[in-house]
């Protein structure tokens, strides 16, 4: 009776690894030719979960993570400082444990530039231009 349970656990773990690996590799947003520094930062660090247009990504859902849809007009409720803090220190201190911290890999200037880019995604969504 113990062997079937172990086999089931091994199979489920294997399927999880395969599914997770494929989700990570497939449809990963790539910066277009001539992309700005901030576009490369966003697409390289944020788009995997938040989507290239800030509307969320199916990849995050596979891991049962519900990242914020940055392009939604309702996201405008957060201040620039809140966004800076969550990008720099991660979401755990602010009640968003799925959000990783980027303070060790990004300068404060890069984080500020990224925050401005993210805020612009929200403005474009509010005006109906996101994704166009």
Feature annotation, model-predicted:
Residues 36, 77, 105-109:
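Soluble non-cytosolic domains of exported or imported proteins
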Residues 41, 82, 110-113:
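Charged catalytic carboxylate motif
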Residues 16-43, 128-132:
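Electrostatic cytochrome c docking/interface patches
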Residues 64-69, 88-122, 126-132:
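Axial heme c-ligation environment in periplasmic c-type cytochrome domains
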Residues 1-12:
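N-terminal Sec-pathway targeting helices
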Residues 12-18, 54:
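Hydrophobic core
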Residues 39, 51-85, 102:
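Gly/Gly-Pro-rich "capping" loops immediately C-terminal to redox-active cysteine motifs
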Residues 42-52, 99, 114-118:
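The canonical Cys-X-X-Cys-His
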């Amino acid at each position: 009776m113990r062997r079937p349970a172990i086999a089931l656990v091994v199979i489920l773990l294997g399927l999880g690894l395969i599914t997770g690996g494929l989700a990570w590799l497939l449809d990963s947003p790539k910066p277009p030719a001539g992309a700005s520094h901030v576009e490369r930062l966003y697409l390289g660090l944020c788009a995997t979960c938040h989507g290239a247009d800030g509307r969320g990504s199916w990849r995050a859902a596979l891991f049962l993570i519900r990242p914020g849809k940055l392009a939604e007009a309702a996201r405008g409720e957060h201040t620039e400082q809140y966004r800076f803090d969550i990008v720099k220190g991660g979401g755990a201190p602010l009640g968003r444990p799925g959000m990783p911290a980027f303070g060790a890999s990004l300068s404060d200037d890069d984080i500020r530039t990224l925050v401005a880019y993210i805020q612009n995604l929200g403005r474009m969504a509010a005006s109906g231009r996101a994704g166009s």
